[in-house]
From Swiss-Prot:
Region (Coil 1A) residue spans: 78-113
Modification type Phosphothreonine: residues: 408, 418, 428, 440
Annotated glycosylation sites: 16-17
Annotated segments matching region Tail: 390-448
Transmembrane annotation, as ranges: none
Site features described as Stutter, chain residue numbers: 333
Name of the protein in question: Vimentin
Region (Coil 2): 251-389
Natural source organism: Cricetulus griseus
Post-translation changes: One of the most prominent phosphoproteins in various cells of mesenchymal origin. Phosphorylation is enhanced during cell division, at which time vimentin filaments are significantly reorganized. Phosphorylation by PKN1 inhibits the formation of filaments. Filament disassembly during mitosis is promoted by phosphorylation at Ser-37 as well as by nestin. Phosphorylated at Ser-38 by CDK5 during neutrophil secretion in the cytoplasm. Phosphorylated by STK33. Phosphorylated on tyrosine residues by SRMS. S-nitrosylation is induced by interferon-gamma and oxidatively-modified low-densitity lipoprotein (LDL(ox)) possibly implicating the iNOS-S100A8/9 transnitrosylase complex.
The family this protein is said to belong to: Belongs to the intermediate filament family.
Amino acid sequence: PRHLEPAGSNRSYVTTSTRTYSLGALRPSTSRSLYSSSPGGAYVTRSSAVRLRSSMPGVRLLQDSVDFSLADAINTEFKNTRTNEKVELQELNDRFADYIDKVRFLEQQNKILLAELEQLKGQGKSRLGDLYEEEMRELRRQVDQLTNDKARVEVERDNLAEDIIRLREKLQEEMLQREEAESTLQSFRQDVDNASLARLDLERKVESLQEEIAFLKKLHDEEIQELQAQIQEQHVQIDVDVSKPDLTAALRDVRQQYESVAAKNLQEAEEWYKSKFADLSEAANRNNDALRQAKQESNEYRRQVQSLTCEVDALKGTNESLERQMREMEENFALEAANYQDTIGRLQDEIQNMKEEMARHLREYQDLLNVKMALDIEIATYRKLLEGEESRISLPLPNFSSLNLRETNLESLPLVDTHSKRTLLIKTVETRDGQVINETSQHHDDLE
């Protein structure tokens, strides 16, 4: 019998069949053992060769008497045994032919499965391997590109951050300058107000001086008129009193004195007025120059403040746009990174599935190889059995005519064992990781 178990089983079956025929002097003994074990998934089958053993027990025959009935009985029994063996051999040949057909069929199936396996390996190697390598190269290229883009974006971000810091510092400086300009402008406005007040004061002073000059001029004219009237009166008196020369000379002296005093006073008044007017004009010019310069500086500072305000607004807009672009780039990069991570995870799952499928194909291939090995071993076993049967059949028959028969007493002959004995040994061995963990044996004796 043939015992096959799936690969990976740890149970071993050992079946021993012993068949013994004992017939008087001729005892053919046939022993056949079939060991089948599968430690770790490998099948091992061993069969012992068929042995034909002829024994001649101590049969004592007398020379003077020959009993041919015993020889006929032995020949008849031997012929029956040979006939039974031929029938059994014919059945064994038929079974072996069926087994050969089955082995050929299994070999063909094995070849078909091997061809399919090679085809699957070739397809997997040509299609899946190339696709996997190409996809991995593409993913590596994309990862490198994303790494370069990330580095470039980080550099741009750092540059923009530095620009923002520099612009903020510049903004602070401009704000400080603006505050200083506003404070300076405020002081200049105070100076302008003071200059305006001084100018108004000077204008009032000029008006008062002009009024005073007009009053003095009017007073001078009145004095001149009075002096002229007095001179005319004195001249009349001189004309009347011609006979008095001393009075005329005195009047002339007085008139000269008055004229010299009036001319001196008039000259002094004109000089004072001119000097005062020159001083006031110079002060007014100075104040006008200071006012004009203050106005120019105020306009210049106002223009600077407006330009700085516009520049600050432009820098704020640029900063906001750059920050918005940076946020958008970070969001896009995070989204692309998540997509690439999902793609990498999906590809890794596909690779794992492919590895599992390849492992399953390899296990199936290993199982097929184990089955093929077991079949080869079993074929070799049956071949040895057939060779043993052929060698047993080809043995020459014993020549009973050449036996040295002697006279004997039939009653002294031993009893002839006319029954057949068949011993069946079933041995079960259970192994795990190449070590025997359980072993049982069962003996069955059958008499025929």
